[in-house]
Structures are given as structure tokens and as C-alpha cells.
Curated annotation (Swiss-Prot):
It is found in: Cytoplasm, Cytosol. Residues 60-98 are annotated as: FliD binding. The keyword RNA-binding does not apply. HAMAP family: FliT. Keywords: Bacterial flagellum biogenesis, Chaperone, Cytoplasm, Repressor, Transcription, Transcription regulation. Its main location: cytoplasm. It comes from Yersinia pseudotuberculosis serotype O:1b (strain IP 31758). One of its GO terms (biological process) is protein folding. This is Flagellar protein FliT.
């Protein structure tokens, strides 16, 4: 029984961390998300050797299935939010690169008073 309780506790810890990571991704707190991801990966690693099939209790197996389902749903949503952030960063890098090219081009003309993006 104690082993079952320990197993359930391990999965609950992973689920809690997963929910916290989802909340951080939702509010776009990327630095905190990366920091928390290390704890999440460690918790997953700690439970890697324990499998649902090794549990004899059908009730415990169902509880763990529910937790795993929730964890996987959180993972999918976190990945979606991270992809959206990556797309935004790629767009910003592209804009910056184009702006630098324009500024270099216009900067070659000595009679040009202002570079694009500068104010008088």
C-alpha cells in the first residue's frame, strides 16, 4: 500500500509541475517556465522506472491513467504556446534583419540625414 501511495504521489507531483508550467506558458513567463522545466524533468526521471502495469490495484491504475492523461494534455498545450512564441520571435528576428539591411543601404549615402527608424 505504501508503494502505491508513493507512486501516486510521484505522479501527482508531475501533474502539479505540469499545471504550473502551463500557467507560466499561458502568461508568457518564459524564464520561469524554463527554470521549472528542470524540476519537471527531474520528477519525470524519478518515476521513469515505475510503470502502471506493475501496479496490481485497478483503482490505482485508473488514478494514474487520469493523471497521465492530464499531464499529456498539458504537454500538448505548452508545446502549442511555445510554438506560438517561437513563431513570434522568428518574425521579430526577420523584421530586425530587414531593418538592418535598409539602414545599411541608406547609411551608404553621405547626404542622407536620417536612417530609417530614427527621429529628427
Amino acid at each position: 500500500m505504501e508503494r502505491h501511495q508513493h507512486l501516486l504521489s510521484e505522479y501527482q507531483q508531475i501533474l502539479t509541475l505540469s499545471e504550473q508550467m502551463l500557467m507560466l506558458a499561458t502568461v508568457e513567463n518564459w524564464d520561469a517556465l524554463v527554470d521549472l522545466e528542470m524540476a519537471y524533468l527531474k520528477a519525470v526521471e524519478n518515476t521513469a522506472n515505475i510503470t502502471i502495469s506493475s501496479c496490481s490495484s485497478p483503482v490505482l491504475q485508473e488514478l494514474l491513467r487520469q493523471k497521465l492523461r492530464s499531464i499529456l494534455e498539458n504537454e500538448i498545450e505548452i508545446k502549442r504556446l511555445l510554438q506560438r512564441r517561437l513563431d513570434k520571435l522568428s518574425e521579430l528576428v526577420g523584421q530586425s534583419t530587414r531593418q538592418q539591411a535598409v539602414n545599411r543601404t541608406y547609411g551608404q549615402f553621405p547626404d542622407q540625414a536620417l536612417l530609417l527608424g530614427e527621429t529628427q
